[in-house]
């Protein structure tokens, strides 16, 4: 482009993109390609991407307005310009007042063009949240930009799978009240935990089973359980955004079927899933009448206690009554509706479901009719979605409307809880005291301060943020796993990972109880919550010299044990010979019987000693592994109902510390390390991407479909060496931001064990922070601990944490209009000494949470 033409374009950009009036982010850009986007491309892009230059084999010279044929290219332009990858850093950069309208124009055009072709929602994707420039959010607002008052869009928000199954669990199981003497034990209001196999299931009557036939697998197949219905992709990061989840027809059909099971259990308890003779406090009575043969794995293999443990509700009263009355039916409909929607029905809704149930009773009789009618309520919109439409408020001049009454009350409840509002919050809603910011502040402060009020949504934030709960779902190669130093066969490893998730949950809760410098503590704590089997996972692989010394010590111990056993064997032989003589001489039967018992004991001892002489002492322990010492106060972690017989998960845990210099914080715990690994090895790229996105606030564009994103298969080569292919010029632009941040974690293997050598050579855990956005952070790091320490002390890292908290509690990506909300939340977090409670209160009382547009 000529200098003269560039001058003309600059003038056009100044008039067009600079706007006659201040630019308001998010407002529709009502300009056409020729007069606007084309000029931006001419000035900022064509110098490198015209037909003559064509850098990266890409020409934009003939690119026209957005249409379905070039939508992919425009999406790529949007990503590159958003991340400031283009124009390159050495080139003149567009001002914010030029770049932001250009990006808004692309988004608007892609939404318009792709409306009937699957739509365009990339800008709403939680993984694209960092595409918004961090410095714009926390720095001074550039000239020419004016912010609109914050508000979230009107929406209906599907409940999460965890929230849905916890709602249903409330109908059929009575969870214990909070016990301050046993914090950590599963309590009413806690989320339903996954079971021993990582499945999220609803169990019927598990708390009443007192006997079963068979072992662990037989129990698991005998007990009545139903899996979670609502779909959710089990992947890294936040996923609970309203834009990305709905309820399909298959799910609706399943919900209806499960609703019938639930209604019947509410009415009849185990009688709905078992025969009357199975319900007894004396299992021997069932043994006399049970079906003959092998019942393992069948529902008839179970025996239930007669003690009623489920909630006895109006549904029970309705079905128990010999005569159907309108009052009983009314109470049952009211109860079920509020139980699954968290609010009382309107007169119209009540009339509708009474009619449905009454007609069903007329057609098929009372029992089946009640089940059919009440099951329909489980498919009510508000049983599956939470509406935030601002139906009660009055819109202001700027188009915003504040949530009020039930909409606001349920939004506040959802911010912390999975079960319906407690009595105080419900009464506030009914009394009209959930209409102002002060009302919200009052209720949120109360609930946050009350330990007995369970807050599973807070814990879920940390699961989604850290992604430490995925380790049990990564299918490991048995041989590769065995080489790490942990059991490589059977389900032991996967059970250990699901236990590790529960343990990490508990550690986070302990840090939240202290509520001081929460993020820094999570990143740097030396504390761990562990089971007794975690000594291997928190252990360290020995050096070659240490292994040789351990093997030599084992051999020496075996030799000494054999020598001692040989001497003991001779002694036992002499004793047995003498005893044989006594037995022969014994005349009365009682004496002989006593001597025979003594001989049997000596022969058992002789056999044990002979085994030691033959095979050695069988010294316990892996000579290649130094196991961690698990000692400290006994505590509890939250686990599922009995799901695997006697092999079910146990809540008992130990609060201990890790060896200094080996680990630091959650990012060095096996739960996080394995969650960021693959079947065969570590996943340094995934770990580095996590650091880049979750702590540094950087963004990574999507991998082009033409890229074969595979490392070479070289089993006897270190991961660092195999990752050399990512240093190719085409790859390194993105991998430079990830690889050097993930490779410091090579001081651990893919089962999470600490190591100093790999394939017989010293491990290289060095790395480097580049282009972090904070010059004080950039530079080399020695290993993962050095990296974590630097990051934990960074102001930028805390601000990025605030951004992620915003996304989670608002259910959307932040926009530039949310800048003041984010800045205020950060100041509150800092002034409170890093309090999570203060941060949540700030976010939940912000305009972005309270208002809809």
Question: Model regions: which residues?
Answer:
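Secretory-pathway/luminal and periplasmic proteins that interact with or process carbohydrate-rich
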Residues: 55, 87-88, 112, 343-347, ...
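Substrate/cofactor-recognition hotspot
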Residues: 186-188, 196, 206-208, 212-215, ...
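Bacterial N-terminal signal peptides
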Residues: 6-16
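Short coil/turn segments at secondary-structure boundaries
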Residues: 89-93, 116-123, 277-279, 346-351, ...
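Aromatic- and Gly/Pro-enriched helix-to-coil junctions and flexible linker segments
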Residues: 18-285, 289-297, 301-310, 335-339, ...
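Sequence context surrounding c-type heme c attachment/ligation sites in exported
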Residues: 20-76, 80-101, 330, 579, ...
């Amino acid at each position: 482009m000529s200098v003269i033409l560039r001058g003309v374009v600059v003038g056009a950009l100044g008039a067009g993109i600079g706007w006659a009036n201040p630019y308001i982010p998010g407002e529709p850009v009502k300009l056409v390609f020729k007069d606007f986007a084309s000029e931006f491309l001419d000035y900022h892009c064509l110098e490198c991407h015209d037909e003559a230059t064509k850098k990266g084999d890409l020409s934009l010279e003939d690119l026209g307005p957005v249409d379905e044929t070039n939508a992919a290219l425009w999406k790529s332009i949007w990503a590159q310009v958003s991340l400031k990858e283009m124009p390159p850093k050495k080139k003149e950069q567009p001002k914010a007042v030029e770049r932001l309208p250009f990006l808004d124009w692309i988004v608007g055009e892609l939404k318009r063009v792709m409306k009937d072709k699957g739509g365009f929602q990339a800008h709403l994707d939680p993984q694209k949240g960092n595409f918004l420039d961090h410095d714009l959010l926390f720095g001074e607002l550039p000239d020419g930009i004016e912010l609109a008052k914050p508000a979230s869009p009107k929406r209906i928000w599907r409940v999460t799978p965890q929230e849905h199954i916890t709602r249903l669990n409330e109908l059929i199981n009575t969870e214990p009240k909070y016990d301050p003497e046993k914090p950590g034990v599963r309590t009413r209001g806690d989320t339903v935990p996954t079971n021993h196999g990582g499945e999220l299931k609803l169990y019927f009557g598990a708390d009443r089973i007192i006997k079963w036939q068979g072992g662990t697998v037989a129990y698991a197949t005998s007990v009545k359980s139903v899996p979670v219905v609502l779909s959710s992709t089990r992947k890294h990061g936040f996923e609970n955004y309203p834009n990305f989840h709905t309820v399909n027809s298959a799910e609706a059909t399943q919900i209806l079927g499960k609703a019938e099971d639930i209604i019947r259990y509410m009415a009849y308890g185990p009688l709905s899933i078992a025969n009357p003779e199975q319900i007894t406090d004396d299992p021997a009575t069932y043994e006399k009448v049970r079906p003959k043969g092998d019942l393992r794995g069948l529902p008839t293999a179970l025996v239930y206690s007669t003690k009623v443990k489920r909630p006895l509700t109006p549904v029970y009263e309705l079905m128990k009554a010999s005569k159907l009355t309108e009052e009983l039916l009314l109470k049952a409909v009211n109860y079920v509706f509020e139980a699954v929607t968290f609010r009382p029905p309107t007169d119209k809704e009540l009339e509708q479901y009474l009619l449905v149930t009454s007609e069903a009773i007329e057609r098929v009789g009372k029992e089946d009719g009640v089940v059919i009618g009440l099951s329909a309520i489980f498919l009510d919109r508000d049983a599956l979605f939470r509406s935030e439409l601002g139906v009660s408020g009055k819109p202001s001049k700027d188009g915003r409307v504040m949530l009020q009454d039930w909409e606001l009350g349920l939004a506040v409840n959802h911010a912390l809880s999975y079960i319906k509002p407690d009595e105080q919050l419900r009464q506030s809603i009914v009394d009209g005291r959930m209409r102002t910011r002060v009302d919200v502040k009052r209720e949120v402060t109360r609930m946050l301060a009350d330990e007995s009020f369970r807050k599973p949504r807070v814990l879920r934030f940390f699961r989604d943020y850290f992604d430490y709960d995925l380790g049990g779902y990564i299918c490991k190669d048995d041989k590769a796993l065995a080489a790490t130093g942990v059991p490589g066969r059977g389900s032991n490893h996967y059970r250990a990972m699901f236990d590790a998730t529960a343990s990490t949950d508990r550690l986070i809760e302990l840090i939240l109880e202290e509520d001081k410098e929460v993020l820094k503590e999570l990143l740097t704590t030396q504390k761990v919550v562990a089971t007794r089997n975690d000594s291997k996972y928190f252990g360290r692989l020995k050096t070659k010299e240490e292994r040789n010394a351990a093997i030599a010590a084992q051999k020496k111990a075996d030799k000494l044990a054999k020598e001692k056993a040989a001497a003991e064997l001779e002694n036992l032989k002499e004793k047995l010979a003498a005893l044989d003589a006594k037995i022969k001489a014994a005349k009365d039967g009682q004496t002989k019987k006593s001597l025979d018992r003594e001989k049997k004991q000596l022969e058992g001892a002789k056999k044990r000693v002979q085994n030691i002489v033959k095979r050695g002492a069988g010294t316990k322990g892996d000579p290649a592994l130094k196991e961690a010492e698990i000692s400290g106060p006994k505590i509890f972690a939250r686990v599922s109902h009995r799901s695997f017989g006697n092999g079910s998960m146990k809540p008992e845990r130990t609060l201990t510390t890790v060896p200094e210099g080996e680990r630091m914080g959650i990012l060095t715990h096996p739960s996080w390390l394995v969650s960021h690994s693959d079947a065969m090895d570590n996943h340094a790229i995934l770990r580095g991407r996590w650091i880049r996105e979750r702590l540094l606030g950087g963004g990574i564009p999507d991998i082009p479909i033409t890229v074969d994103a595979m490392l070479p298969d070289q089993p006897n080569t270190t991961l660092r060496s195999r990752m050399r292919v990512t240093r190719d010029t085409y790859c390194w632009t993105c991998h430079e931001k990830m690889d050097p941040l993930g490779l410091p974690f090579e001081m651990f293997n893919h089962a999470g064990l600490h190591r100093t050598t790999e394939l017989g050579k010293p491990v290289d855990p060095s790395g480097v922070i580049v282009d972090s956005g904070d010059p004080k952070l950039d530079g080399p790091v020695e290993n993962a601990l050095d990296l974590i320490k630097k990051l934990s002390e960074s102001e930028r890292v805390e601000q990025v944490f605030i951004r992620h908290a915003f996304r989670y509690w608002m259910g959307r990506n932040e926009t530039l209009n949310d800048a003041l909300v984010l800045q205020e939340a950060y100041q509150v977090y800092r002034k409170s000494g890093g309090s999570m409670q203060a941060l949540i209160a700030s976010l939940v009382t912000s305009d972005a949470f309270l208002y809809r547009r």
